[in-house]
Amino acid sequence: MNKFSQSRAKYKPKIINYLLTAEAPPMESSGRFFYYENMSKGDSLFLEIMKVLYFGDNPNLSYIRQNKNKILKQFQKDGFYLEDSVEFPIEGTSRQKIKQIKEQLPHLKNKINKLAKENTKIILISATVFKACYEELIKEGLKIINRESIAFPGSGGQKRFKKTFSALLKEHGFNIKLTH
């Protein structure tokens, strides 16, 4: 089990209510990862998801960073789990990334079938993941709840991410809990 898998497994809920499927882990040399507990910079996917779920429009980013372990435990308790479409970092243009993700679809389907139960809601995060996976996963009978791509919350996509992600969660029964 690699470092990414170990960090992710620590926060796997017993029952996954919402399976968030993102693109790929970052380069290991970056020192960044959604489930790494000690992050002082970057971490946009984690920060933006947690703002929507727990902190609203005016979050205390230093509080979030200092309490990442506690926040990840709440994320786990609420039945959220983040997986990547691809097990390894990918680079290139959007077209190249889509191709790489499609090549890994059999592995992703297998992983999702092991994780998702009948009531698990699956959310595809980023245009590349949506374009590469949506149709095939729907054909597989998986419960993908977004019918359009959700912008990755980096490089200017934060507002679109927040709007789409929060509306989707509300539509599918998650009561957003602002804690700070």
What does each model-found stretch correspond to?
Residues 50-58, 142-175:
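Short, flexible loop segments at boundaries between secondary-structure elements
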